[in-house]
């Protein structure tokens, strides 16, 4: 079933590999709407350990590769986030899309800038190892959390509020947009969906796909909208779905002409 038609869809912070990733719901959005451009705005992966990807996560990646086929006439862009840093070369081959740190395009006479937003997060930049430790602790909590992952999602929301990231990222993004003479700027990273106008620049945050409220952005001639996923959350036990090498993973690597998945199972020790 095809829903509304848009020029651009923007999704961020899907965190493939995380127990709370709503990859199936994100895939549902991609398959429901019609669009000319798809911007994956960073942190598509939770980390660089492919062994944590479930069958649903591989299906999401496989669909991205299908969208990148020129016959689809969809421009697919991957903007690098702090969690998927280091995957640019592999992802450009695996799913067939270009990877950027900053992406600029024009639509309806306005310059648009997309960047993940971690560039304005001083804590992430200055405390890399503390951040890695926090990721590991959060992973352990996810493993023992209930089926609905209520505790994990609550901690994720509180984490972004403790760091006061939302306002900090917005201010930094607006400054960058002004320097680049862009009228609109889009970020992720904070997991908090937001829209505001500051000094003549429209700022939008696409939210995340790890919370009970999953959000994404749409752009058409009427403007930019924050959309909330209307379907239900797919509750399941991801740890029971992990296989040594999922069939979807093997097919994806083969279609990309890359060596077997085993060589990439963990890109960060």
Question: What are the residue ranges of the model-derived segments?
Answer:
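Extended, basic/helix-rich recognition subdomains
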Residues: 162-221
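Divalent metal-coordination and catalytic microenvironments
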Residues: 13, 38, 43, 64, ...
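Active-site-proximal beta-strand elements of phosphoester/diester hydrolases
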Residues: 7-15, 111-118, 202-207
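Conserved catalytic scaffold of divalent metal-dependent phosphoesterases
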Residues: 77-181
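Core catalytic region of metal-dependent phosphoesterases/phosphodiesterases
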Residues: 2-7, 16-107
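Active-site environment of divalent metal-dependent phosphoester hydrolases
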Residues: 16-19, 45-49, 79-89, 119-123, ...
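Binuclear metal-dependent phosphoesterase catalytic core
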Residues: 107-108, 197-269
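Mobile, glycine- and charge-enriched loop segments
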Residues: 1-20, 130-163, 240, 245-246, ...
């Amino acid at each position: 079933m095809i829903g509304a038609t848009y020029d651009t869809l923007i999704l961020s912070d899907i965190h493939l590999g995380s127990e709370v990733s709503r990859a199936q719901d994100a895939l549902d959005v991609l398959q429901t709407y019609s669009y000319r451009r798809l911007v994956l705005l960073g942190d598509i992966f939770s980390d660089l350990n492919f062994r944590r990807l479930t069958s649903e996560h591989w299906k999401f990646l496989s669909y991205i590769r299908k969208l990148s086929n020129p016959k689809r006439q969809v421009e697919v862009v991957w903007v690098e986030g702090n969690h998927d840093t280091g995957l640019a070369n592999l992802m450009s081959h695996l799913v067939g899309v270009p990877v950027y740190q900053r992406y600029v395009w024009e639509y309806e006479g306005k310059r648009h800038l997309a960047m993940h937003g971690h560039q304005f997060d001083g804590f992430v930049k200055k405390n890399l190892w503390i951040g890695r430790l926090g990721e590991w602790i959060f992973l352990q909590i996810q493993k023992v959390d209930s089926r609905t992952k209520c505790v994990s999602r609550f901690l994720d929301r509180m984490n972004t509020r403790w760091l006061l990231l939302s306002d900090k990222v917005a201010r930094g993004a607006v400054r960058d947009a002004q320097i680049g003479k862009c009228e609109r700027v889009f970020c992720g990273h904070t997991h908090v969906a937001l829209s505001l106008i500051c000094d003549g620049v429209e700022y939008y945050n696409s939210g995340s796909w790890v919370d009970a409220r999953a959000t994404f952005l749409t752009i058409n001639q009427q403007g930019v909208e924050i959309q909330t996923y209307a379907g239900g959350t797919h509750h399941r036990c991801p740890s029971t779905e992990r296989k040594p090498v999922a069939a979807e993973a093997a097919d994806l690597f083969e279609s990309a002409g890359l060596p077997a998945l085993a060589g990439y199972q963990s890109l960060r020790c």
